[in-house]
């Protein structure tokens, strides 16, 4: 396995924003899940989305 684990896009079907419960968009370049309604970007580390508001980046 390489140093980067890819995010499985099928997870987007089950994941929602923890703030708004709205759907998320995947930013492959930045390895983030984007909540447009909450204006937050949740990081993906080693293929695992970190869905903690405290870890999110404000947009």
UniProtKB/Swiss-Prot annotation:
GO cellular component: cytosol
Organism: Cereibacter sphaeroides (strain ATCC 17023 / DSM 158 / JCM 6121 / CCUG 31486 / LMG 2827 / NBRC 12203 / NCIMB 8253 / ATH 2.4.1.)
Pfam family, one: Trm112p
UniProt name for this protein: UPF0434 protein RHOS4_00640
Family per record: Belongs to the UPF0434 family.
SUPFAM superfamilies, A to Z: Trm112p-like
């Amino acid at each position: 396995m390489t140093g980067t684990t890819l995010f499985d896009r099928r997870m987007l079907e089950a994941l929602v924003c923890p703030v708004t419960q709205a759907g998320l968009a995947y930013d492959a370049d930045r390895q983030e899940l984007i909540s447009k309604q909450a204006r937050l970007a949740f990081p993906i580390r080693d293929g695992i989305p970190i869905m903690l508001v405290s870890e999110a980046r404000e947009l």
